[in-house]
């Protein structure tokens, strides 16, 4: 449980009987209580049970946890223009150093994101403050195969959340934040309502030197860490090379592998490494081959592997409405001829709860784009693809309907129907609206 989200007025709860550890759902950003297995555990009491890991100095256990999540966080953050240091600090704060029930195996949900992931979820009783009172609800939380998918999902939230006025977290992106402090300031009041959220992240980043993970994921043709390269062949074709590299602050095996065009597994094998942990000043042998087109001479050019960014498509047009008394997602889906799943996807809703005065996207058509596959590639446009939404057919599920039956009726593959309606399983519900064509 994050320190920054605790109500000090609940200090008297320290004297109560110790209750099972629970987790806090950060997506709603409400300070409250969590009900696990029928036992109500306050957020303050959770803190009292878990204070030690939050105030400890850099120990072997904390460094081990940092390294274990950094291996997933850095490549994901680098590929999507985010600060790895900030993402790692968020994971530490949201999961209380991986001690929250939800962040541990078999759930691996570091950020408390609700919903399902590839059809898998775990249900816990939680309390939310709605309409002036606490309400206990059964809420599904996503279950991931590993920390890597948890970081990818959190990245998707940071890159694609849009309430109609542009990307909601754009100021936290590396392109718009000159320093990690700018990024944490941009998250404060948005990702978390606590005014000290950014300061808490900054303290973790500073104390554990997390900026060492903010180094460039690829470094062009310049060696800045001190390396000696020996070429065994300068002729045209494939040049086999052996390089001794000295680890510097901010280096990771993944970053080095990207810089020199070899895999992490190759580096580990060449240096008999049993993990991805490396140390400043450590000498690493980098062996591999680099493709070259030189017909002679001794000049080398380092080749880096480009990363792929998650860039949301810009909507060509969209319709938004302000929620009024009596509105429900089901009623809005019927009125605007779409599905509840689609409304939740457009508005990044983790539950069916909506609020009076909330702005919701109820209709949206995305502009088509042709990603480049490299220099000299040719993109072919199909003029029929831009009109696919105009022929969409919405079906209300009735008793006896199945995805297979609807696919036979509409002539659309089951996979397409699931993709259009963001279904993670083959389960459909009576009264549900589905796009089937």
Curated annotation (Swiss-Prot):
> Could you give a GO molecular-function term held by this entry?
amidase activity
* Pfam families assigned: Glucosaminidase (PF01832), LysM (PF01476)
Domain comment as written in the entry: The LysM domains are thought to be involved in peptidoglycan binding.
**What is the role of the protein in this entry?**
Hydrolyzes the cell wall of L.lactis and M.lysodeikticus. Required for cell separation during growth.
What does the organism's lineage look like at the top? Bacteria, Bacillati, Bacillota, Bacilli, Lactobacillales
At the top of the EC hierarchy, this enzyme's class is hydrolase
What this protein is called in its record is Probable N-acetylmuramidase
Per the record, what are the reactions this protein catalyses? Hydrolysis of (1->4)-beta-linkages between N-acetylmuramic acid and N-acetyl-D-glucosamine residues in a peptidoglycan and between N-acetyl-D-glucosamine residues in chitodextrins
- Protein's organism: Lactococcus lactis subsp. cremoris (Streptococcus cremoris)
């Amino acid at each position: 449980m994050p320190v920054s989200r605790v109500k000090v007025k609940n200090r008297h709860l320290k004297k109560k009987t110790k209750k099972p550890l629970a987790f806090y759902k950060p997506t709603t950003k409400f300070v409250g209580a969590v009900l696990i297995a029928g036992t109500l555990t306050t957020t303050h009491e959770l803190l009292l049970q878990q204070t030690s890991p939050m105030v400890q100095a850099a120990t072997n256990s904390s460094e081990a946890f940092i390294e274990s999540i950094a291996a997933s966080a850095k490549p994901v953050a680098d590929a999507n223009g985010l600060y790895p240091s900030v993402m790692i600090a968020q994971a530490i704060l949201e999961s209380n150093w991986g001690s929250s029930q939800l962040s541990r195996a078999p759930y691996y949900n570091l950020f408390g994101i609700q919903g399902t992931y590839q059809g898998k979820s775990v249900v816990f009783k939680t309390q939310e403050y709605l309409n002036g009172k606490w309400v206990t609800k059964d809420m599904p939380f996503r279950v991931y195969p590993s920390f890597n998918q948890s970081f990818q999902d959190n990245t998707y939230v940071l890159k694609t959340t849009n309430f109609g006025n542009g990307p909601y977290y754009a100021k936290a992106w590396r392109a718009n934040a000159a320093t990690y402090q700018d990024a944490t300031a941009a998250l404060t009041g948005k990702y978390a309502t606590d005014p000290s959220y950014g300061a808490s992240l900054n303290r973790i980043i500073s104390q554990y030197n997390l900026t060492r993970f903010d180094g460039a994921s690829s470094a062009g043709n310049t060696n800045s860490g001190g390396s000696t390269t020996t070429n065994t062949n300068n002729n045209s074709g494939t040049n086999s090379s052996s390089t001794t590299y000295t680890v510097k602050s901010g280096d990771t095996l993944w970053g080095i592998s990207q810089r020199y065009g070899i895999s992490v597994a190759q580096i580990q094998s060449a240096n008999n490494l049993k993990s991805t942990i490396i140390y400043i000043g450590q000498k690493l042998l980098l062996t591999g081959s680099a493709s070259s087109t030189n017909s002679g001479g001794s000049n080398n050019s380092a080749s880096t592997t480009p990363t792929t960014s998650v860039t949301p498509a810009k909507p060509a047009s969209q319709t938004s409405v302000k929620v009024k008394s009596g509105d429900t997602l089901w009623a809005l889906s019927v009125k605007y001829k779409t599905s509840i799943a689609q409304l939740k996807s457009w508005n990044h809703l983790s539950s069916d709860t909506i609020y009076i005065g909330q702005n919701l996207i109820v209709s949206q058509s995305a502009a088509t784009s042709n990603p480049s596959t490299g220099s000299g590639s040719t993109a072919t446009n199909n003029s029929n693809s831009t009109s696919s939404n105009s022929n969409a057919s919405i079906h209300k599920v009735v008793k006896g309907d199945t995805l297979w039956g609807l696919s036979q009726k509409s002539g659309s593959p089951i996979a397409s129907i699931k993709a259009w309606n963001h279904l993670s399983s083959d389960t459909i519900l009576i009264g549900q609206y589905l796009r089937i064509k």
